[in-house]
């Protein structure tokens, strides 16, 4: 889902046939590999290419920054693990940040992000006074959903996204800690790679409702909303 840029090609112009030649011919396509092959010793970072055509004169190739997935990590022991491995496997670059204590965090340009991952943590999703960075994370979550940018929330991240979209947060009837089953309830088989019921690790006190427009994906005996999706 986050691999929308991994095979990016842009209609542009063809680099000339000789090594180091920057002349362009319109009506063809330039790929990252093509430019590496044709640019001699030049070093190119990223693979989204913008070619500026200058008539019959020489043209300029501008290399745009490689889109990154922003991973928001709140505590050292809640790491992205296999999420990070899978992102790397499909060729996406990532940047991991902890902004939980920062009122005005210096975040990457939103338009240049390929996606957002919000990890877990022991704080509450609405603990803005103690952890001011959570408010920035909620704002980022709303922007991602509104723009259709891929976003994934795990545990606390799931709660941050839900509350950012208007869902209610409350204490559960009892802490849910340890391995226990959840039931897949999605009607569109979004988690079709899993059994209808599977055992996962739980560690939370708070629970959230389903935000407006959300589709319920999984629940457990004590938590009605274990997973949901929203948007595209």
Map each language-model feature to its residues:
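Targeting/processing segments of secretory and organellar proteins
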Residues: 35-38, 44-52
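Low-acidity, Ser/Thr- and Arg-rich intrinsically disordered low-complexity segments
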Residues: 3-13, 19, 23-26, 31-32
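Catalytic nucleophile loop
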Residues: 144-168
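N-terminal beta1-alpha1 cap of cysteine-dependent amidohydrolase-like domains
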Residues: 21, 52, 56-149
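Pocket-forming structural segment of enzyme catalytic cores
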Residues: 165-232
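Ala/Thr-enriched low-complexity intrinsically disordered regions
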Residues: 12, 28-29, 48, 52-60
């Amino acid at each position: 889902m986050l691999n929308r840029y991994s095979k990016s090609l842009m209609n542009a112009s063809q680099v000339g046939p000789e090594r180091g030649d920057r002349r362009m011919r319109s009506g063809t396509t330039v790929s990252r590999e093509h430019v590496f092959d044709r640019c001699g010793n030049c070093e190119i970072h990223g693979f989204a290419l913008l070619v500026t055509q200058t008539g019959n004169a020489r043209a300029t190739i501008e290399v745009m920054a490689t889109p990154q997935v922003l991973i928001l990590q709140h505590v050292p022991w809640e790491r992205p693990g296999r999420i990070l491995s899978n992102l790397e496997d499909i060729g996406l670059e990532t940047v991991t940040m902890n902004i939980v204590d920062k009122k005005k965090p210096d975040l990457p340009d939103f338009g240049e992000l390929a996606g957002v991952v919000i990890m877990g943590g022991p704080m509450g999703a609405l603990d803005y006074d103690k952890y001011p960075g959570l408010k920035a994370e909620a704002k980022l979550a709303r922007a991602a959903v509104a723009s259709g940018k891929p976003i994934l929330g795990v545990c606390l991240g799931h709660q941050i996204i839900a509350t950012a979209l208007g869902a209610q947060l409350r204490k559960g009837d009892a802490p849910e800690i340890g391995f226990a089953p959840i039931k897949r309830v999605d009607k569109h088989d979004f988690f079709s790679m899993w059994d209808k019921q599977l055992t996962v690790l739980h560690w939370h006190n708070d629970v959230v409702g389903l935000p407006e427009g959300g589709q319920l994906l999984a629940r457990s005996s004590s938590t009605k909303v274990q997973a949901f999706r929203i948007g595209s």
